[in-house]
Amino acid sequence: MDFRELDRQAMKVTADVVSQIRPDQLRLPTPCADWTLHGLLRHLVSEDLAFAAATTAGTDPSDVDWNAGWLGADPVADYQRAAAGYLAAFEPDSVLDRQMRINVFGVFPGSVAVTMHFIDTVVHGWDVAKTIGVPYAPDEQLCAAALKVMRRFPSDRPTPAFDVIVEVPDDVSELDKLVAFVGRDPAWA
């Protein structure tokens, strides 16, 4: 399955949330343990830049700097530029078969890299929205697709990428199920 369209949708919803960040909110804590909103936004910028760079880099771990995203005077604009670069890099169909190193996780075809980015975007979009207190409403089918992929990952937690699964009732939204599966409390405030 080509996850690029789902990733584009997730990025649009996340960009809408990011566009609402005010400078005075950058020091707020987020649902991501150890990260302020500034740190989380820097992570998103770093990931977008690094995923884009990985499409043309080699597979050696030193080929891409996964922490290269810096926020200047306008962090929202920095995010928008990095996101646009990511989308452009993953536009060609040929990128889906290209082997690329994704941070410490290993070497994957671009089709898997897009899927990883998609999940990261959906979850971190929720993190940003919760932090600044604005609605976050990605399509339920988009969230269900992300959850389906996540359920393939081991549930043995915590790991460097995911915290212990949070138990939620069966009748919560697909988004709440997803964020709970990656270790976030859907009721975080």
PLM features: residue spans?
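Structured surface interface patches that mediate subunit assembly and partner/cofactor docking
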Residues: M1-E5, A10-D16, Q20-A33, A50-A189
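Extended, alpha-helix-rich binding/interface surfaces that flank or overlap catalytic cores
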Residues: L40
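Glycine-rich loop at the start of a catalytic domain that most often binds anionic cofactors/ligands
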Residues: H43-L44
